[in-house]
């Protein structure tokens, strides 16, 4: 039985202008403007952690942060294009019998729009978004994938340390794509491999030992 390949969306399957560093700066500024003190140590927090702190301070502030996230995502999806090699890699994996899924921190609406506009929607039978599961690096999305694909091992493919941390926390194997090995190591993420071209993935999986 082939393992499941679960892909992150932005900067893994889809190339877009979504700038998570800029978004994080804007969310921090919004939260601090509303009287929430964020220490220097919180600069290592994920966007989700900052929004959780904002929500604990005031629910409407958390909602404002999520609205800012959605605005950035909607702007980014308008100019989204397939990541180089995505079509070829997914076609080869499907032909080889691998089930395919998407696991993203985006909303379902944005994720479906991005996949459709890039011509990738037909490859996937399951889509896990922040509408269904907590944000990565929380591994709860992995539990949903396991329920959808029982008895299958799972490879998680993504560009960020949060993808790897979520995979590791949930007991899945992580394949990094275009990621910075130094940042992965700093975050305690140990990928099975780091690929620079998605078209390398089918052949790598063919010879990979679990």
Please report, for each region that a protein language model flagged, where it lies by residue:
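Asp-based, Mg2+/Mn2+-dependent phosphohydrolase catalytic module
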Residues: 1-3, 108, 112-210
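Conserved phosphate-coupling serine/threonine residues in phosphotransfer and NTP-handling enzymes
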Residues: 104-106
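A short helix->loop->beta-strand "cap" motif at the edges of active sites that frequently abuts
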Residues: 97-98, 172
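Residue-level marker of alpha-helix boundaries and capping positions
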Residues: 80, 102, 154-155
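N-terminal helical cap/lid subdomain that shapes the substrate entry/recognition surface
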Residues: 1-96, 109-112
């Amino acid at each position: 039985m082939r393992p499941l390949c679960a892909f992150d969306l932005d900067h893994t399957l889809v190339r877009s202008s979504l700038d998570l560093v800029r978004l994080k700066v804007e969310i921090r500024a919004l939260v601090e403007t509303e009287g929430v003190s964020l220490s220097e140590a919180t600069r290592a927090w994920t966007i989700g952690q900052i929004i959780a702190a904002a929500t604990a301070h005031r629910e409407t502030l958390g909602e404002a942060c999520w609205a800012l996230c959605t605005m950035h995502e909607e702007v980014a999806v308008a100019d989204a294009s397939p990541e180089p090699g995505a079509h070829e890699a997914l076609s080869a994996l499907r032909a080889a019998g691998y089930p395919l899924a998407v696991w993203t921190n985006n909303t379902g609406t944005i994720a479906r729009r991005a996949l459709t506009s890039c011509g990738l929607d037909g490859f996937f039978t399951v889509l896990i978004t922040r509408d269904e599961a907590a944000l990565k690096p929380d591994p709860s999305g992995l539990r949903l994938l396991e329920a959808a694909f029982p008895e299958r091992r799972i490879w998680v493919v993504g560009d960020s340390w949060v993808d790897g941390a979520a995979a590791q926390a949930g007991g899945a194997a992580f394949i990094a794509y275009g990621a910075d090995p130094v940042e992965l190591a700093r975050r305690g993420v140990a990928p099975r491999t780091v690929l620079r071209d998605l078209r390398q993935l089918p052949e790598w999986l063919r010879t990979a030992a679990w």
